[in-house]
């Protein structure tokens, strides 16, 4: 419900020790051959290139436009995808970091819709790293990809596989050492959910302190609560 006020089913949310374990879980799930590719932005957060290498996949770069405030250039994205396919690479997923890391840009809704259309057209899992959603300093507001998906056609809304990632390490809280986070799945099939459950079970469960932090952040003080004035001041 934190993602744009859209209803969330408990079975579609997994608590993790920060965002990184969830990201690595999905990359591990998607990559089973050296010709399995994952599209990642350049510049990027090094976790993605390292994890793709760790799991034996192929990194497929797409380049952000520095001249256009580090926006995603869809012509460049299509070119990168085509070049990868021509080399025999089976592209499985598309990673987007919004707000950007390390670039800091916030994507417009129009740009997000184009990415959603691209992923749907090419049957790619859209992995949206949204851990910096509360570190916004410009004029463009943050829109969750889950909310952007809701603006699309019924066919795309029901057909695109989307996974979003959240962490207590960022935002105004910045609790890096607590290791709390979660990922949320949209349109993931039952068979795939079974595999995700198995992979997640290997780690038993996320740590309790991190879980507590997630609960406090998603159920933060609301207007009218006794603690709200102090919360607003410190935020």
Which residues does each predicted region cover?
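Conserved core segment of the aminotransferase class I/II
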Residues: 54, 147-235
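Conserved core of the PLP fold type I
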Residues: 1-118, 127, 133-155, 164
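Residue-level detector of transmembrane insertion/anchoring sites
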Residues: 119-120, 160
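Internal amphipathic alpha-helical segments of the cytochrome P450 catalytic fold
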Residues: 23, 49, 88, 128, ...
